[in-house]
């Protein structure tokens, strides 16, 4: 068994759910990746079971699916990104793949639903609901943001981390001690982060243009659009980026009904949602204007 998952809270949670229900905690079987990172599927065995959770594919990256199909792998593709929805719409031959493709809930929520045959998000564990509420930008739950910041205080929340095992065990035992502790830590972390980000934006945020749209930019990859605070409301788009030594990694965001972040990201080889997407480049074309 192999599992490829997206490199964010939702993807790691989805990977953790795979680990729990398959009882596979072998680190070598899990691969964290961004939208257009190279995937190690050439090393996968023929007829191997491969979970692709919270992971988007586009016209430029569907060759990975084709390779897995040629290898006669059992593919379980669970995803909620707009890019994936459009790919499946344009290529009905992929509809035969096992899994769930739906934009209604996050990748982690869909992964839980897949393994447990759960239909209603409210029947998912509380931690899954928080992850989905944040990742889909629904903000229907009071403590969602505090939970997100609290998770960032955890030194390791990869899919094999004990934090997920605690969450799941507490779900089945009908108590929420660990989640409550995470939320308490998140309240403190959020206040600290807001103060730091406000000063950081004051000194380093700048405005560029992305596909004809004014965009507020910050060289700070973690935190997403939340790093801008109220400043994000003044521009139709926002962008955070970081250089990893080889590539510039970009995340873009927008609440403008006329801006499709996934379409912009796909032009650069990436993908994602209408309101949030990502890609990477070898250069930095988004200069200050």
Locate predicted features.
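Glycine-rich, Lys/Arg-enriched anion-binding loops that position phosphate/diphosphate groups
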Residues: 135-221
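N-terminal G-site helix/loop of the GST-like fold
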Residues: 7-32
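Divalent metal-coordination and catalytic microenvironments
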Residues: 8, 18, 54, 79, ...
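Short, highly selective alpha-helical patches that border small-molecule cofactor pockets
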Residues: 11-15, 107-108, 228, 261, ...
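Short hydrophobic beta-strand segments
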Residues: 1-6, 215-219
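Gly/His-enriched, cation/cofactor- and phosphate-binding structural elements
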Residues: 48, 187-289
């Amino acid at each position: 068994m192999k599992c490829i998952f997206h490199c964010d809270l939702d993807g790691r949670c989805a990977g953790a759910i795979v680990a729990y229900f398959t009882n596979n905690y072998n680190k070598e079987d899990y691969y964290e990746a961004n939208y257009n990172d190279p995937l190690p599927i050439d090393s996968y065995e023929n007829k191997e079971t491969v979970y692709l959770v919270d992971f988007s594919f586009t016209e430029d990256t569907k060759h990975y699916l084709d390779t897995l199909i040629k290898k006669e792998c059992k593919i379980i593709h669970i995803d909620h990104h707009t890019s994936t929805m459009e790919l499946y719409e344009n290529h009905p031959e992929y509809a035969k793949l096992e899994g769930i493709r739906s934009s209604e809930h996050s990748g982690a929520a869909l992964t839980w639903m897949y393994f447990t045959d759960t239909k209603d998000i409210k029947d998912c564990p509380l931690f899954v609901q928080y992850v989905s509420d944040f990742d889909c930008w629904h903000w229907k739950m009071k403590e969602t943001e505090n939970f997100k910041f609290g998770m960032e205080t955890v030194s390791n929340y990869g899919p094999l981390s004990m934090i997920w095992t605690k969450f799941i065990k507490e779900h089945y035992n009908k108590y929420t001690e660990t989640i409550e502790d995470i939320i308490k830590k998140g309240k403190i972390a959020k206040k600290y982060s807001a103060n730091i980000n406000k000063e950081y934006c004051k000194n380093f945020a700048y405005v560029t243009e992305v596909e004809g749209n004014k965009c507020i930019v910050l060289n700070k990859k973690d935190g997403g659009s939340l790093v801008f605070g109220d400043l994000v409301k003044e521009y139709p788009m926002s962008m955070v980026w970081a250089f990893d030594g080889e590539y510039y990694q970009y995340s873009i965001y927008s609440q403008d009904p006329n801006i499709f972040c996934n379409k912009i990201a796909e032009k650069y080889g990436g993908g994602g949602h209408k309101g949030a997407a990502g890609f990477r480049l070898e250069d930095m074309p988004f200069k200050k204007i």
